Amino acid sequence: MSGRGRPRVVGTAGHIDHGKTALVHALTGIRTDRLPEERRRGISIDLGFAPLDLGPDAPPASVVDVPGHEGFVRNMVAGATGIDAVLFTVAADEGFMPQSREHLIVLEALGVRNGVVAVTKADLVSPEWSRLVVETVSEELADSGLASAEIVVVSATLGTGLERLRQALTAVLAALPVRPLDFPFRMPVDRSFQVAGAGTVVTGTVWSGTVSEGETVCVLPAGLEARVRSLEVHGRPVDRAEAGTRAAVALAGPGAGGARRGVTLVGVDRPWSASRRVDARLWLSGSAPRPLESGDRVRVHHGTSEVMARLRWYGDGAVAPGETGEALLLLERPLVPAVGDRLVIRAYSPVTTIGGGSVLARRPPRTRGSRRSDRGRLLERLADTSGQERVTAVLGAAGARGVEEPGLSLDTGIGAAQLAAISLEEDVEAHGGRWFERAVREDAMRRIAESVAHHHETHPLETGQPLSIARKAVRDADSALVEAAIHALIEDGALERRGAGLAVVGRELDLDPEDARLLERLERRYREAGLEAPETDDVAGDLAVDGSHLRGLLRYLEREGRLVKLASDWYADAGAVGRARDLLVARLARDGAADTGACKEALGVSRKYLIPVLEYLDRSGVTRREGNRRILAGGDS
């Protein structure tokens, strides 16, 4: 990167034959009308590119020269997307023209509010006429984002005004905020061609992040990967291209074949995804011929892509010219958006630019009825907020699921550095690589604490609630949030771990006299039975005890180490099982292996009682079954 600052991209705009290409040539020395047809017809058809050196005090820059002909507005939009500032041209001999106005609408839609206006071809008119044109241009721009832009009268042929134009551009570019490098890499492709020895080469403006030689990128929406063989910035080989640069990327691999204008290069380890559904705040130009209604088909320009979409307003069924609204765009082909991305909206037929907007959500949920109304209100809130308020709104909508850390940048339009600063605030926090509202974690704590307390009341013989059950107290929650809530409850002294469960701190078992007597009878019953333990339902009938209550007593004796659970509903005396284990281990140590008959002989029980004991010893890692034989676990057969 140059010591003069981060790279910038300037785009031209203006009516056909208003001197855009000639002015770029005068500023850069490069002819951007590269196509034979462009030079034959004397007009720009596709995009042209050149380095823009404005002097030692200016940041490094590139210029994108766009066509002015009404038939090539889609190419103009593809070039204007991603620019930092505009060089808007109006010919002195013609003044403001229809494509001047349409290009101005496109710039408004893209949020381009910085630039310089050049009144070109001053050599063709008198100075008095040039002054009149400047006044007219100023009036035309009065209600636009370029209202305060400096207007410079120039002649590319004579060179007059060019130095002042360079100074004006330098001032504009120097005052612009830098594009963050901590936002995930993304580069919409505007050209693709084959180069001998290099293979597929694509060009574009790096919208965000960085890309390096040798790195693997993903070509979206196809999802195929490609390796960056080499990088160039204006014909110079570089190791890395960063946000704000015009880059040529040589690709190799499966994704290279599908890399063409309209696709997007992203980093493979980043959370970018293609989507056919986008929520957006849209505005309709005051010059639009009619209201835009729900169900209308429109052309959506995003990056270098143009896709057809069906529009659904969240509020009223139509938006009148000059008004705004929140809408769902159902795209016929996927885009690769981030929140805050700009959109240009053009009519289906006749094809004219009618408005624009910005992305509010890149993967909106499907909603109906009241939930759709709630969604509309959330989008209004998102559209009118930024920074921490937007983060809070997004996390509030995500609830206990949270948002993955890299994806939060794309869902809010905020880079990693600003997110890190926001994480220091009190109302948001990160756990396990995901972000949550603090209130969501506090609600999870409350639900888990209530669940554990309720378990104590309904299972008085258990020392605590199993963790697997406690975790289910927070429905549809990310596991990282649940673990953070449990950790906080333990740190606060509200809960404690007991074995594989959670218990309220200070809560002890308080056996009533009847349960104490039942436990004594149960322990004696199982001790006397040895391995020939009774089935649980039989015990419940013999002792006239409710089955659920009996199972609670049995689990208590198991936790105390007095019983062993052999099967799902079968317990045996722990001492008897221990003696059986010792007998079988001694037999296997002597003989190496024993079939079922030998095991039955060693333990002196029928097959009914033998098999549960053998399976328990297998699960416990004492023995291992091989066919019909048992061997010691870890031993050789």
Question: How should these model regions be labeled?
Answer:
Residues T12, V125-S130, T136-E139, P254-K565, ...:
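C-terminal effector modules of nucleic-acid-centric enzymes and ribosome-associated factors
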Residues D17, L23, G42, D65, ...:
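Residue-level signature of catalytic and energy-coupling elements of molecular machines
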Residues H69-E70, A92-M97, V112, K121-S126, ...:
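Conserved nucleotide-binding/hydrolysis micro-motifs of P-loop NTPases
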Residues A91-A92, V116-L132, V152-T160, L165, ...:
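G-domain G4 guanine-recognition motif of GTPases
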